[in-house]
Amino acid sequence: MKKLFALLAAGLLAVMSGCGGQTASNESKSSAQEPVELHVSAAASLTDVMNEIGKDYEAEHPNVKVVFNYGSSGALQQAIENGGDADLFFSAAQKQMNALEKAGLLADGTRKDLLQNEVVLIVPKEGGKDISSFDQLTSDTLTHVALGEPKGVPVGQYSEEILTKLGILDAIKAKAVYGSDVRQVLAWVASGESDAGLVYATDAAISSDVRVVAKAPAGTHKDIIYPAAILKDSKHLDTAKDFLAFVSNDKNKERFAKYGFEVK
């Protein structure tokens, strides 16, 4: 009788253990599929390509929603410093990323140089003034020259470097109008509100309403590097790491190249 009781007890324990293991397994599986809202702050010049990448990532990870916040790198940096919700930051310049790193806001070992770009001079495709070089920006025939705001907009900082190196910055200051990000500069030229503007080559490439008349001469500005990093306070560190790796895969390297970026 004692032997029979022991056998029955052992069997019951095995069944209970099996159920417990199954429950734990189900809980683990359920946890892995919990909804995740990944917040990505990215430079405005990355809007089109990152929207494509985000859709692909969501298709492969149905439990993840990628929420993008686009703007000037300077404005995004300030928002992050002020506690804004961001898991990753894609900047159009090292300056803003350096500031966040110095403040201790980046997750250790996650910063990487992702892309490279260049600055070009654009004019409206139709009905624009007849200019073909940076030097002609000083002409009295031009009323407005669109630039990025130099304090917080990387393309504005690069533009000032270029115009200073060419010795024409002071000559065009009276006609300069400053956009809050590179897409505003592009829009002003595309609409004809500005006679010319300085934007990234990748932004000029997506508009059928502007034409490129000159590239910034070599040596007139710092290399235009786009760094990326995960924020230390990310609520979804594992997903953020996975997304950053996804952005850098071979398929997306080709996608960046399609938009005119040089992949690092």
PLM region descriptions:
Residues 1-24:
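Sec-dependent N-terminal signal peptides of Gram-positive bacterial secreted proteins and lipoproteins
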Residues 8, 97-105, 111-115:
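N-terminal hydrophobic signal/anchor transmembrane helix of membrane proteins
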Residues 19-55, 74, 78-82, 93-94, ...:
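Exported/periplasmic ABC-transporter solute-binding proteins
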Residues 38, 64-66, 119:
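Conserved beta-strand core positions
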Residues 55-67:
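Signal peptide-proximal N-terminal region
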Residues 65-66, 109-110, 213:
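A short linear hydrophobic-aromatic micro-motif
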Residues 70:
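Conserved strand-loop elements at the edges of beta-sheets that form or border functional pockets
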Residues 87-91:
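Periplasmic-binding protein-like
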